[in-house]
């Protein structure tokens, strides 16, 4: 009888476990707590597997890739795409991933963006595998590092005679190289008239020289599920991005839309639907098709997307969000503690918008930062990989450079 009682108790226990697992709030709480515990040592430019299930696709050159169970970490440059599982109560699944991405900020202070993705989310890295080579200053004079690849651009640093730096990218004719400043993570441009290297600069990625340098997961395609959660306590599938304290404004390229934020922002996006940029703290400026608007805390902006997640409209005017849409966001699991801003009144949003600078821009149109026939195929800095430049044999064209060679100390 005793053995029979134990058997019955075991059967009862085994049937109650799935019921417990099917409790939505409990599953969310467990998934986020697991992510906190397993991912607390995630380093700069790393992704961490927080909770099941995640499926990662790697870049072709990556070997010995491991990112298959909670707690696994990898460099974000290894990841081509990342797909998270929607909530599946019967299997106890609700995908969570944490990423620490170096902030694309004009400040030289090293800082990390926090990206927390949850639920039915897919992220695809739009930055190609990085290329680099060492180059050295030629001659006995110091040379200038410039903000843009031309002799009239502002000076952001300098190099000493014979100093060696890392070059990451080049313009299409090979006349300028984008290099990392020796004293910071900031990037700048040097003329190849004054540099030499043992490698072939044609192996460097080709860029337009106007857009900022995007590192892995600073430019990505993102989509989230559209199904409403059946549990009121569960946040809708999406992505939260938080900037670090004191980093200033950070620029990202999301679904070919420029987003500049200094804040905590919640993103959702569906094919042939909208990308919704919801600012729960701070501000976010959204730019597409030559138009930009700023959503302050308590408001959101919509951008219409096509089936391939490309923008097909300018951003909407900011509008108040519904508190029910943000109340359950997992902000307690972000490094910088905040409170979700109450929705602003639409009249207040309109007043704030009137005090902002003109919202039309020339940067987007000139750089094909839109869609349709002028749609870019890359996030500004990565239009071509290596020698795939349609530039004949790839020889450096210097026919116009010698005019300034003796007039400037590198400009």
Question: Across the structure, where does each feature detected by a protein language model lie?
Answer:
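N-terminal signal peptide c-region/cleavage motif recognized by signal peptidases
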Residues: 14-16
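Short, polar/charged, low-complexity connector loops/linkers at domain or secondary-structure junctions
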Residues: 285-350
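Ser/Thr/Gly/Pro-rich low-complexity, disordered linker/stalk segments of secreted
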Residues: 335-411
